[in-house]
Design a protein with these regions (language model features):
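Alpha-to-beta junction loops
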Residues: 60-63, 79-93
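Short helix-initiation/N-cap motifs at beta->coil->alpha
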Residues: 67-81
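Short, polar/charged alpha-helical segment
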Residues: 41-66, 126-127
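Short, low-complexity disordered leader/linker segments with a strong preference
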Residues: 1-29
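Contiguous mixed-secondary-structure segments that line small-molecule binding/active-site clefts
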Residues: 52-53, 89, 94-150
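Extracytoplasmic "Venus flytrap"
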Residues: 32-49, 70-74
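Immediate post-signal peptide segment of exported/extracytoplasmic ligand-binding proteins
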Residues: 20-36, 56-63, 137
Length: 150
């Protein structure tokens, strides 16, 4: 009996997963957005859901976004490689994950490096901050913006 309950649960999850994936129509460009947070309480998850709704409303027939929260598709350690392989098109990993490409991103992990969140914003919008973000382009990743992670 326990096996049947487990099998039924697995089937329900598989059907649910297929239903989510079927939201995009044939011919639409599919944009997969993978992140590690929940969708109802964390600002990153809420923003990802709102972006998904906007893309799907405004790009109807041209592009379709599917958001995969809670590491359901990739975790922060895997997502950059998945992007380089074309398996996912958008992600919002912790900035520390970019250290595998360049050590300059360690700057954001140094304690007390910035006086407050406004100082972080000022640095990220500065010429130096923008150069850091753009440094990922030659590695095959395009940074759209910095996103606070805590």
């Amino acid at each position: 009996m326990k096996f049947l309950a487990t099998a039924a649960t697995a089937l329900a999850l598989a059907v649910t997963a297929n239903t989510v994936a079927a939201a995009c129509d044939d011919g639409e460009i599919v944009i997969k957005f993978s992140h590690v947070t929940n969708t109802d309480k964390h600002p990153k998850g809420i923003a990802a859901t709102l972006l998904e709704q906007r893309v799907n409303d405004e790009m109807n027939g041209k592009a379709c976004m599917e958001v995969f929260p809670n590491s359901t598709l990739y975790n922060d350690n895997q997502v950059l490689e998945a992007m380089l392989q074309g398996d996912v098109q958008m992600a919002a990993p912790s900035l520390s994950k970019f250290e595998q490409f360049t050590k300059t991103f360690r700057l954001f992990d140094l304690p007390f490096m910035f006086k407050n969140i406004n100082a972080v914003d000022e640095f990220q919008t500065s010429e130096t901050g923008q150069a850091m973000k753009e440094s990922m382009t030659r590695r095959g990743l395009i940074g759209l913006a910095f996103w606070h992670n805590g």
